[in-house]
Amino acid sequence: MNKLHGIELHPTTAAFLAQPRRMLIGGEWVNALAGETLPVVDPADGETFCRVPAGEAADIDRAVQAASRAFESGDWPKMRPVDRERLLLKLADLLEANAQEFAELEAIDNGKIGRAHV
């Protein structure tokens, strides 16, 4: 998908939408345990533009357990505040550097793709 509603998508956005969607749990990209997916529908025309894992209770439990382990015994609680700050600032830099792609994805998800999202 390089275009949506006749609007040329940023190459990174198009590549992202073309990839299979998975969930990040415990540092690994995984499918839903049941293997099911759900359509992500463009509200503007009702067309499916990608599919996402249909996480169920077991997937949620797995994610919560992994997050609890990471928070209680992972690297984050052992980090000095200044090191946490550096990571969060790096995240902010990455979000800013990729703002166009995030804006396109949000516009698509809300059915508002067009010149207004640029």
Task: Name what the model sees in each region.
Residues 1-52, 86-90, 118:
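Terminal low-complexity tails and localization/encapsulation signals of metabolic enzymes
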Residues 49-117:
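Glycine-rich loop-to-alpha-helix module at the N-terminal edge of alpha/beta enzyme cores
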